[in-house]
From Swiss-Prot:
It comes from Brucella anthropi (strain ATCC 49188 / DSM 6882 / CCUG 24695 / JCM 21032 / LMG 3331 / NBRC 15819 / NCTC 12168 / Alc 37). PANTHER family: LOW AFFINITY POTASSIUM TRANSPORT SYSTEM PROTEIN KUP, OSMOTIC STRESS POTASSIUM TRANSPORTER. It comes from the Bacteria. InterPro entries: K+_transporter, K_trans_C, K_trans_N, Kup. The chain crosses the membrane at residues 41-61, 82-102, 130-150, 163-183, 194-214, 235-255, 276-296, 309-329, 366-386, 395-415, 426-446, 450-470. It catalyses: K(+)(in) + H(+)(in) = K(+)(out) + H(+)(out). GO terms for molecular function: potassium ion transmembrane transporter activity; symporter activity. It is a multi-pass membrane protein. GO terms for cellular component: plasma membrane. Transport of potassium into the cell. Likely operates as a K(+):H(+) symporter. This is Probable potassium transport system protein Kup. Keywords: Cell inner membrane, Cell membrane, Ion transport, Membrane, Potassium, Potassium transport, Symport, Transmembrane, Transmembrane helix, Transport. It holds the Pfam family K_trans_C. It is found in: Cell inner membrane.
Amino acid sequence: MSGELNGNDTPTQAAMPAVGVPESVAFAEDAEQHNESMKTLVLGALGVVYGDIGTSPIYAFREALHAAASDGILARSDILGVVSLIFWALTLVVTIKYVLFVLRADNNGEGGILSLMALVRGALKGRPDLILGVGICGAALFFGDAVITPAISVLSAMEGLEIVAPDLTPFVVPITVVILVTLFSVQKLGTGKVAIVFGPIMALWFLALGASGLWHIFDDPTVMVALNPYYAVRFLMISPGIAFITVGAVFLAMTGAEALYADLGHFGRKPIVRAWLWIVFPCLLLNYFGQAAFILSHGEAAALPFFQMMPSFALLPMVLLATAATVIASQAVITGAYSVARQAVQLNILPRLEIQHTSEKLHGQIYIPRVNLLLGLAVVILVLGFEKSSNLAAAYGIAVTGNMLVTTVLLYIVMTRIWNWRVSRALPIIVGFLIIDIMFFGANIIKVHEGGWASIGIAAILVLIMWTWVRGTRHLFNKTRKAEVPLDLIVQQMTKRPPTIVPGTAVFLTGDPKSAPTALMHSLKHYKVLHENNVILTVVTASKPWVSSADRARVSQYNERFMQVTLTFGYMQQPNIPRALGICRKLGWKFDIMTTSFFLSRRSLKASAHSGLPLWQDKLFILLARTASDATEYFQIPTGRVVEIGTQVNL
């Protein structure tokens, strides 16, 4: 296998300059193409990665000022303290923690909390359940964030209508609901055709942020003294109680920072970093400092400073641009939710889900109907229940701070176990990050009664579902394994006393390659026949995102009648069994789909008082198993080649 070549195995020819072309010219052309490609990726990152954090100026500074003025007084020192906190939070958390460290902790180029969990589980063999639990919590918090982001983003943009036309205030929530329902309704059509405009629109958005902020900085240029951390520290120390509440609101300026890591696989580290350092970070800072300067010179403008500082002729266009930006931010989060859900299914944290591909060219563009429906319903319910973006702000921070806290914990394991850093080197950095994360998490967790319960409730329900699925599948595996016959024994018996042999190939899917598949045993028991060729097939998900076709299949022969095939897929890949079995032709097995039957076991589960799991968890697991997508569709097996054999199992 290692000696075989594929279409990508001739890099030396591709790297050589064209014959007759001076080397300097060839390299100049390569450099120009590289620069154009980099610009495209940077523009793409603006549209996907930075939509969430890019729309934070609409509400983050406003909420932080409201918290700082909770004692009824908003002094100049409060305004400078808040903008200084935002500047240093963005610098320490996004620029240093994520850009310098977290983005380097990729799993074969992929990012995201489940990728990080899989990477750490592969490196830390001793405590797999602990790491799995941490990863499940992180994934649940991500889904909580995915519910809140579209609601607060679009709602905050629509609130700009209150400035444009106060008479439209009663219609803010209905218009928001219409936009969100439309957004979720068109997901099944795919986003490939419209995604091409996301980057340019977000580039225009960031330029508008920077320009409007820069213009108003001249209202009071002394606002720039807030770059000095003295003002942030002074604000924290003068009124610790009010400052602690304000810190929770300041964190809203960083919501979306986790997207830098989650979308790492789509764009790569360099485009994400360059987009942040060249465009996003400078434009965000200009806007926040511009809002601060505007309020310093117009003290009465703290209600909706983002829209109030716009000139009258630009107000309506800015509301429309903000709406487009928040829809794009919502789309990025929805797409991210699909990706995380697929990873969770592949890692066996969730039951199989129907996954539809919306693009023939881009395999990453998927649509998951069940996730879309549940996410859409939850978002609309939040909008109708909370009605104002300021009410949702309390719910927003908990999910994101929790996700960041989980990321920091896993990052420490990456540093010490994968990067092989000494503890004395890694610990001070991680402790610094943990202090910041815990401070933000603590400042947000006290808002449970104000709306934080929604975020915690969503995450808790998802943790319960995922952990029940993990425990239930393990229990079912152990229970069925005790009752099953070792495969070696069946092979020996069939060799000594073979039943009637029928032509063709039978493929038996099983999760336990050491035991005889249930479908095989029932076939022998009821039909008393054995196929000419019998394949015991196991599908394995690797702890890395992508597995090459060269490493896809492993074949071992028991005897002339039985062989074992193991197919390995990455957790970002959609299993296609017929296509993968075609690779086995190179390994000596002449696979022919037209003479092959696939035998699948369909278990009917029943709750049992003696299962070892609580009865309620038994029933929840059974419900999840019943809602799982059909294995035939999930593994993309032609329905005409499938034989399903049903069995009943008492948990």
